[in-house]
Amino acid sequence: MTILDEIAEYARERVKNAKENISLDEIKKKALSMPKGIFAFEKALKKEGMSFICECKKASPSKGLISPEFPYARIAKEYEDAGADCISVLTEPKWFLGNDEYLKEISEKVNIPCIRKDFVVDEYMVYEAKVLGAQAVLLICSILSESEIRHCIGICDELGISALVEVHNEEEIDMAVRAGARIVGVNNRYRAIVVPFIKSHKTLQGFLTSGNPKLRI
C-alpha cells in the first residue's frame, strides 16, 4: 500500500465520522442554500501571463513538520499582499496536520479564491468544501474513478466552484478530460517514493496543450 492509498483510506474514515455528526443530506442542503459561486478560482487562472497558487501547509509526509508555529492566517494574507492569485489550504489532518478551520478562517480573511487541498474520496467532501468557504476542490485521479471525478465536477458546477483535477501520467490526463475537467494539475512526484521529477511535468504539459488547448494547467 502506497502512502497515497493510506491517506485515501484515512479520508474515508474521516468522511464516515463526519457523516455521524452531519449527514450527507444536511451538508448538501447547507451548501446548496449558500449563494452559488462564480467560479472565481478558474477565472483567477485565466489572466494573461503566469498565475500563482500559493500554499498554506503545516507539514507533509516527505518534509515532516514545516512550520511549527504556523500562523496560517498571516501567511495567507502575506501571499495575497505579494500578488498571489489563489491560495491552497491543506485540510488533511493526519499527514499534513491540516484543519478545516484553517480554510474557513483564511477564506474569510482574504479576497482571493481558496482551494481546499485534501484527498477527496466522497461527494460529501465537495459539499463540505463549499460550506467551509472554498472556491475550488482538488480531485486526484489516482484515488478516484472516472465516474467519481465526473460526478464531483458536476457537483462543483452546481455549487459554482471549480475542480482542479490532478494527474501524473497520460492515462490520467485522458481520464480527466473525459470526465470534463477544465483545470488540470500535473503532479511532479512519483507516488511510491515521493521524489520530484520535473521532466514529467514538461512532458505532460506538452501532451495537454497539444491535444487540449482549452484546458488550464
Regions found by a protein language model. Give the residues of each.
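Generic beta-sheet signal
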Residues: 55, 117, 140, 166, ...
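Solvent-exposed, charged amphipathic helical/linker segments at domain boundaries
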Residues: 144-160
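Glycine-rich phosphate-binding active-site loops on the catalytic face of alpha/beta enzymes
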Residues: 128-148, 185-194
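Flavin-dependent oxidoreductase catalytic cores
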Residues: 205-207
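Glycine- and Gly-Pro-enriched alpha-helical subdomains that act as flexible
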Residues: 91, 112-125, 131-141, 152-155
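Conserved N-terminal beta1-alpha1 strand-loop-helix module at the mouth
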Residues: 1-114, 121, 155-182, 192, ...
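Amphipathic repeat-derived elements
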Residues: 15-17, 22, 141-149
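Short alpha-helix immediately C-terminal to the canonical SAM-binding loop
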Residues: 126, 149, 173
